[in-house]
Amino acid sequence: MLDPKFLRNELEVTAERLATRGFILDVERLGKLEDKRKSLQVATEELQASRNAISKSIGQAKAKGEDVAPIMAQVGSLGEELDAKKAELASLLDELNSIAMSVPNLPDESAPIGADESENVEVRRWGTPKEYDFEVKDHVELGENIGGLDFKNAVKITGSRFIVMKGQIARMHRALAQFMLDLHTTEHGYTEAYVPLLVNEDSLMGTGQLPKFGEDLFHTKPATEEGQGLSLIPTAEVPLTNLVRDTIVDEEELPIKLTAHTPCFRSEAGSYGRDTRGLIRQHQFDKVELVQLVKPENSMQALEELTAHAETVLQKLGLPYRTVVLCTGDMGFGSSKTYDIEVWLPAQNTFREISSCSNMQDFQARRMQARYKAKTDKKPSLLHTLNGSGLAVGRTLVAVIENYQNADGSITVPEALRGYMGGLEKIG
């Protein structure tokens, strides 16, 4: 969430910056609520002071042998009025907090201003798409022909947007995840983590999925008097980032760089009819996530580094890609700046997103109270959090299958994966 003080004191500026991402802040409503908050705050403090002053006079009256009943009645009346004002103030603060939790992050000044994805800005390309002397097939046809992708049984077992992988395709999928983890832990300095696939509501509030995007989640257990509800993770960003929720980290521990390979689960609400064929948009998919927790002054450089780490996976696999910086109107709810990495898919003759790398600055940290403390500082400060896919395993599999296809329907195994696949040079 945004800094409440900044929101209160710079309401018009905040509204202008949020408007660049298509979010309309109700300035009039917030202004009225803030005026009411100030009024209630003053009234509460004045009532508290009056009650305290009159309460002190009770002892003095008793010492003089005076009747204290009228004073006691006055204190009681003030107490009732004070309790009513406190309840009204608490309700108002809850309303303000609810509004604050629904307001997206402010775009960084370096993010290009634009309305939608058509105004994203390409910053670089790597590799040259291969030219084929035969008609290219998509990953669905190639995978089904070698018996590795089984959509029919996935529909029978569960429903649409699920997959059963078998044989050499399943092995390649596993090899990709292992390759990514090894690269990030041995060359990029990340610590591997094994995390829960079910998270509570506090965790989802911390990273920004709740309260606004509950319909995108698979909820497995509703909240009860005994505890919070549980939901399947939409990304390992949630458990990894929440490791520092309600925590004060020593400055010497920073930066903290974490990675995890997990299944991810998304309802894909609002995606009806999009990417219905193949592995591009699934309810369950594997992803290797990258998370960095850094000091504020280092977060923009950390974003460049994290994005480069994700790009390195594609470079080592020999997959052409381009990197774009998202315009303000296309950024995610909690992001201040985002790079999307898009891999080349020959069958679609276009680039498709395979990684999204974002700097959340202190937006998540404020929601989570994730802080760090320098030895020279009296008070702890909010961390900056970053995350990105390094990479989405299923989409990387799609890219490998399509870019490395041969005329006979076989698939060449990229050199980087051969050590993970028993030395196989081809599958199919």
UniProtKB/Swiss-Prot annotation:
Location of this chain's protein in the cell: Cytoplasm
InterPro entries (UniProt xref): aa-tRNA-synt_IIb (IPR002314), aa-tRNA-synth_II (IPR006195), aa-tRNA-synth_II/BPL/LPL (IPR045864), Ser-tRNA-ligase_type_1 (IPR002317), Ser-tRNA-synth_1_N (IPR015866), SerRS_1_N_sf (IPR042103), SerRS_core (IPR033729), tRNA-bd_arm (IPR010978)
Q: What is its main location?
A: cytoplasm
Residues bound to L-serine are: T235, A236, E237, E289, S389
Q: Name one GO biological process term.
A: seryl-tRNA aminoacylation
Q: How does it assemble?
A: Homodimer. The tRNA molecule binds across the dimer.
Domain comment from the record reads as follows: Consists of two distinct domains, a catalytic core and a N-terminal extension that is involved in tRNA binding.
By sequence similarity, the record places it as follows:
Belongs to the class-II aminoacyl-tRNA synthetase family. Type-1 seryl-tRNA synthetase subfamily.
Q: What is this protein called?
A: Serine--tRNA ligase
